[in-house]
Amino acid sequence: MNILGIGSALPEQVVSNQQLEEFLDTSDEWITSRTGITRRRVMKESELTRLALAASQRALLDAGISGQDLDMILVATTMGDYVFPSTACLIQEGLHAACPAMDLHAACAGFIYALDTADSFIKAGKAQHILVVGAEAITRLANWEDRATCVLFGDGAGAVVVGPGEGLLSVRLTARTDRDALYMLAEPGNNPFTRKPDEAPGGVRMQGQDVFRFAVSQSIEDLNQVAAQAGRTVQEMDWVLLHQANRRIIDAVRQRLKLDPARMPGNIHRTGNTSAASIPLLLDEMYRAGLLMPGQLIAMSAFGAGLVSGACVLRWGKEPPKTLTPAEDLFSPPANIKP
């Protein structure tokens, strides 16, 4: 499998830490020092489909194909604009495509799960061109009274078009169920014959220390495994992309693997945790900035509710775009992060 095209889209609305100070018992210093986040993008109601479609259109344009050339659409998302039809079906409609389309739910690791799924269809000879999307409106799921969690999240969409090739060198997917570490209850239905849950829905709930320990240890294990499967070490990778969940997690993984900060770009300071969209958003930003060159090895790792994780090694095959968009602050996150 090779990546043939890539694109992304972000909501227009920017919410700063200072805006959160207006209704939360928090401060810019508190948020930045514990998460590395200074601002995030927030979608309007029912905007996910539009942004996912925009990211998809940009990926198709970059790949030089149209929606009619697609054999499948896979969308990694936690919750779309509709319970049904799927976000993938809505994208298919917008692209005037005529192919199978389905959503895939693996929380923040969903994009890597979807990449591996696409690779399997291509290797089986069932598809030539697959659109893989990571799109999230995760802020709509947040409990905006819980300062420990709501400050973390942001919205966005990223997409890639993949086709046959040998670019995906290794993949590792894991699941270790711990529902209490990170979860959100479904809204109770209106069926009068079913018992309502004892615990009312209240947005995302998280045991922060448990998630931190899992994220750091699992990311290190996954990165070492996929690098070894590719016949390399993590330290030999040209780039290491970690799910943009929390700057302290990213820094802990980098320090324990003794990785050069110049090989671990990040955008969490201005996007927040965009769940399944975080890896494709960062990858597209690097591509548009001219940082990705043919032949470079890219290790990617993500983790999320489940608890689940996914990692892979890609050999990049695309030339940089003709028009570049500078992204200097990918290597200059906020300096006041607490260890």
Range-by-range predicted roles:
Residues G7, A76, H105, I130-E136, ...:
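Short beta-strand segments
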Residues I3-G5, I31, I73, A114, ...:
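Conserved small-residue
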Residues Q68-A76, V234-H243:
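Short glycine-rich phosphate-binding loop at a beta-alpha junction
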Residues M1-E45, D146-R213, S217, E221, ...:
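Condensing-enzyme catalytic core mediating Claisen C-C bond formation in acyl metabolism
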Residues D62, S66-A98:
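Anion-binding (especially nucleotide phosphate/pyrophosphate-binding) glycine-rich loop
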